[in-house]
Amino acid sequence: MKITQFVFGLLAIFSPAVSAQQNHIVIENTNVRYCISAQGRNISFIDRASGVDYLKHDTTSACALVRCSDVEYPATSVFLVNGRLTIEFSEVNVKAVLHVESLNSYIRLTVESVSGDNIESLMFLNIPLTLKARPDESFGSCALSLNLITRVNQLPALQTSLQALCYDKFGIEGAKVAIVATPTEKILTTLKQVLTEADEMPHCIVAGPWANDVPFNHGSYLFNFGSLTESNVDEWISTARKLGVTQIDNHGGRNFFRFGDFVLNHKKWPQGWDTYRSIVKRLHDAGIGSIFHTYAFFIDKQSKYVTPVPDKRLDAFRTFTLAETIDSNDAEITVNESTSGMSTVTGFFEHNSVILHIGDELITFGAVSQEPPWQFTNVKRGAFGTKPASHKKGAKARHLKECFGLLVPNPNSSLLEEIARNHADIVNSCNFDGIYLDAIDGSSILRGPDECWYWADKFVFEIQKHLKKPVGMEMSAMWHHFWQFRTRWQAWDYPQRGHKRFIDIHAASVNSGLLLPLHLGWWNFQQFNPPQVEPTFPDVIEYLGAKLIGWDAGISLTGAIDPDRLATVPLFRRAVDTLCTCEELRRSNVFDERVKAKLREPGKEFSLFEDKSGKWRFRPAHYDSHTASLSEPWSLSWKTWNPFRKQPVKFRIETLMSAGSYYDANNITLADLSDLNQLTESQRSADGITVSLGETSNGPNGSVIFSAASSGKVPRNAAWARLDRRFSPCLNLKEHKAIGLWIDGDGQGQIIAIRLESPRHISYGAVADRYITVDFTGPRLFTLIETESARWSDYVWNDGKGLYNLYRETIDFDMVESLSIWYNNLPKDKQAKCIIGPVKAMPMVTCTVKNPVVTVNGKSIVLPVEMQSGSYLQFNEGNDCILYDSKGQILCRVIPNGDIPMLSAGENQVRFSCDAGDGSVPRLKLTVISHAEPF
């Protein structure tokens, strides 16, 4: 490698007319000049072409820091001689020597030596920048780690701060980083050069800085969970072509292949991976790529590493010592060490197991003592096909690690590398085109969250080292070293409600500084399944398709698209057709950047249509939804907004589920706030919020005055207070999924939220929220059924919840652990004061909407039809009015009575009515639709 030496050295200016501030160290190449004072403080980081200094000057920053005995110390002096930068930390008598190489397109720093006592870590690069790490900036910079022991926290390719660390536990000497600073348009080219010249890491020339050059990385894919066999390859090829996807993701587990040892289900693939090699070849011949999808280093409990003889390289939380000998039939195990705090709670995301490893036997336990004698009881011997045996006093019992229902290799053993090689062997043998390392977001189970970067990176390095050809990767997490092996960014799991808002949040979270091809995720389709799942109506899919085109992002479909489902659920078939069209339009690059910019605007909706010339076009659309119930007369009249020109109204009516009577004796009372003993915790609230409960004689028995006031310390949408009740044992609300609530409102505009939760290990932290906006005064009785999602994102809750908890996961109504009653959006310096009656769980029941009437600005249209819960009516224009069942099957065409009402530009008054029946109270959602001219 040819190294060009540029100016770098100690500039000692001896003229007394020159300020001592000029006595500093300069490290530079053709693009950037980095200046450090002799005292180790950053002075500047200058783009040599423009003269702009990108160093962040709001605070003084040290060029390096050392951590000793858990205290961090800044550099106190630096000097540069013959390409060696010596950094001293006089407060702790530590010295580090860096080899500095100024190359044509980047600068390389290597830690050559370090001396001192109690050194835990060394940050040998620290340059805070004013850059925003956006691709629209003219200048970009990146610190790129050049080996496994060098930690860089920020992701490539564009960064806001350049830092590099190394640790005593992994090795300090030899840590190495590249400083890249260049015009943004050249950053990927430069990073290609850096990685090509990096000799301590595997190379993958189809990922990272090369990713955008590879068509495969821009594709979309279809999931295969084990149904693709030799006998149906042609069907899969046909389906893929119909869907417009060019890849198949082969997701292991279940009845496909085991994680860890990757043994295929021999009933389906009798020749093992030899069979699958021929499947992949047939897909390749048809122009379809294949991805090998695993749960990273996690290990199936039926794998060879577990049964019949458990591998001693399986990792454990801790090790116990048998206090007495046990024979092969004993159902209790006594140990010397404390078992206090241990639990039998396990679940998908839980870091816990009920498995003990003693000798060559695995044992599960059903209970564990919290006080002496320390015992595991209700044990089952010879678990997972191991052999029960006697074990002597003093034998070691290891409590095995588990997450995602899978076991874990000890990362300090050879098993981590062995499983990595297993990946490479399968990919090499079958000629897979990509690897998806799912579950690697669980890497904290190895050695804690602060070491994820090292062990996860090590695992990826080991796979890449053994591949025979460059194979790119996707992963369920992201650390710095992953970027150079990553082909695309940012697949998320699909939402089950709040679809459009979720898409916008997903797109907004895209880290454009990664400069990788985009992927907007794993999608599935839903049909009517209340109260926690919302159907994916055509406008949802058009919204998704528009964003895919706008962002030039791929997509993947996880299920619901096999031929049988598409045949029996026309709603899904229409969704697939729309996505297929959008995918073809995206790949063909039909729309220019001006149109794409419109399509990717958050919240902006579009309808896709084919014009008379056969050309696909988008037109701006607006969907304004409102839920109404005949039992809530205030809900039957409302205002809707049309942002476009005056036009005939279009709408969709969805018949929802209803509920029984609030006063039914068979309801389950979830909270009677007049009984303060029901509250399991004291009231909680945001900063500056005061809360009180008061007695009242108004309202149903058990009513209280719930008061709260905000002093304004937090924004209004973050002004919350909550009351909580826990149920032990959990409540079974399987037949009581609706909520009834009586409220005497104060008209202050706050929201009241009713939240149900199941145990975390069962429902992954999901919540079932229902909201009421208190924009009214006086008493009202509410029936709450459908759970919230999008509106949760309008407020700050400080509840530790994330998007998946609200948009994706569902609670288990069979096991409801808690109820919370919230205020949020409390006004400043005003007391919110509502009377709240008992919160009741009520049965959901079906209802009928008969002969609905939609009135817009005083003009009505009557729809002579009966609609059952789950059905929906789509009225477009003229006589285009169709009633569908919950699967999207056409039930009948409806001929409306009356002239079509006109939507005015701006605000419009809407009213709904229908014939009353003998059954449950009709409930519905009416969505008013308007359009602008196409573009």
Regions found by a protein language model. Name each.
Residues 122-125, 648-651, 662-668, 673, ...:
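Extracellular beta-strand ligand-recognition surfaces/modules
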Residues 296, 300-381, 385-388:
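Autoprocessing Asn-cyclization modules and mimics
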Residues 305-317, 401-418, 462-566:
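Glycan-recognition surfaces
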Residues 335, 343, 381-389, 393, ...:
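Intrinsically disordered, low-complexity segments enriched in serine, threonine, and glycine
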